[in-house]
UniProtKB/Swiss-Prot annotation:
Positions where N6-carboxylysine occurs in the chain: K103
Name recorded for this polypeptide: Dihydroorotase
InterPro entries: Amidohydro-rel, DHOdimr, Dihydroorotase_CS, Metal_Hydrolase
Organism: Escherichia coli O7:K1 (strain IAI39 / ExPEC)
Enzyme class: hydrolase
């Protein structure tokens, strides 16, 4: 990696956790990812969710149809696990190169997850098949019992779901997505080579004070929710250490402004336009820019068993102001860090 003080040249990154939605929203947001990233793991929580090979093929084509000319971008599709999913369908999709991974949403944990899994036991035949064929499991790691505090749901998931699952299926490859706690950072660091994690820019840059002190900031509201500063610091220390089983996953999750700024707002940060520069800022603050390229462009492909990208991009260190909003057909999108001045941005 070449790192003069004002320019960072890195191998083209990938986004290992991304929501692109569908319809007009899809057309609006895809270019913000496809101009920067070579590949992205695309989340399957549409309505209805992507649970068949045919649905994934059709969705992949809708994505590709929106990629601007000149962008070299490959969407990596995922299967939404449900209690009734046929293991043979999953294996067929994996063998045919349609499904790269499968996603476990605990029922009602996040946006469009009402079809999610009610218990791990309900999908054990599917998970056993995934272990057998080497298909990665992507996990939204929160329990959803009504009596468990929202700030405790990730830590409780580790002890009640994740660890028993990994003890039972020892060869299963697992990505603990968008980790937000010291508990999860320690768990992944102490795990073996079959356990990895993604971290979002918002969980590295902010904690719950930023979202709640001096007024509620709905555009920082995402799930898993921002935690206290000791957890934020643990995540920052994990990425700054150069640990090779943690990698870039923005969890960019667009919602129209009126669905965020409401009396019952949706969870999700649309960070695709600003994520890479945000990560660079964090690595610079942690004096860890020497590990930035691996986090963005190497660790993910290594875990998935895929080649790294063979092209490069540059980030420049110069102050730029983020747009206040982005036009949608009948509304607007508010990007992560809207209206703020950022230090790093992708060179156009």
């Amino acid at each position: 990696m070449t790192a003069p003080s004002q320019v960072l040249k890195i191998r083209r990154p990938d986004d290992w956790h991304l929501h692109l939605r569908d319809g007009d929203m899809l057309k609006t947001v895809v270019p913000y990812t496809s101009e920067i990233y070579g590949r992205a793991i695309v989340m399957p929580n549409l309505a209805p969710p992507v649970t068949t090979v045919e649905a994934a093929v059709a969705y992949r084509q809708r994505i590709l149809d929106t990629v601007p000319a000149g962008h070299d971008f490959t969407p990596l599709m995922t299967c939404y696990l449900t209690d009734s999913l046929d293991p043979n369908e999953l294996e067929r999709g994996f063998n045919e190169g349609v499904f790269t991974a499968a996603k476990l949403y605990p029922a009602n944990a996040t946006t469009n997850s009402s079809h999610g899994v009610t218990s791990v036991d309900a999908i054990m035949p599917v998970l056993e098949r995934m272990e057998k064929i080497g298909m990665p499991l992507l996990v939204h790691g929160e329990v959803t019992h009504a009596d468990i505090d929202i700030f405790d749901r990730e830590a409780r998931f580790i002890e009640s779901v994740m660890e028993p699952l990994r003890q039972r299926l020892t060869a299963l490859k697992v990505v603990f997505e968008h980790i937000t706690t010291k508990d999860a950072a320690d768990y992944v660091r102490d795990g073996n080579e079959r356990l990895a994690a993604t971290i979002t820019p918002q969980h590295l840059m902010f904690n719950r004070n930023h979202m709640l002190v001096g007024g509620v900031r709905p555009h920082l509201y995402c799930l898993p929710i921002l935690k206290r500063n000791i957890h934020q610091q643990a995540l920052r220390e994990l990425v700054a250490s150069g640990f090779n089983r943690v990698f870039l996953g923005t969890d960019s999750a667009p919602h129209a402004r009126h669905r965020k700024e409401s009396s019952c707002g949706c969870a999700g940060c649309f960070n695709a336009p600003t994520a890479l520069g945000s990560y660079a800022t964090v690595f610079e603050e942690m004096n860890a820019l020497q590990h930035f390229e691996a986090f963005c462009s190497v660790n993910g492909p290594q875990f998935y068993g895929l080649p790294v990208n063979d092209t490069f991009i540059e980030l420049v260190r110069e102050e730029q102001q983020v747009a206040e909003s982005i036009a949608l057909t009948d509304d607007t999108l508010v990007p992560f860090l809207a209206g703020e001045t950022v230090r790093w941005s992708v060179k156009q």
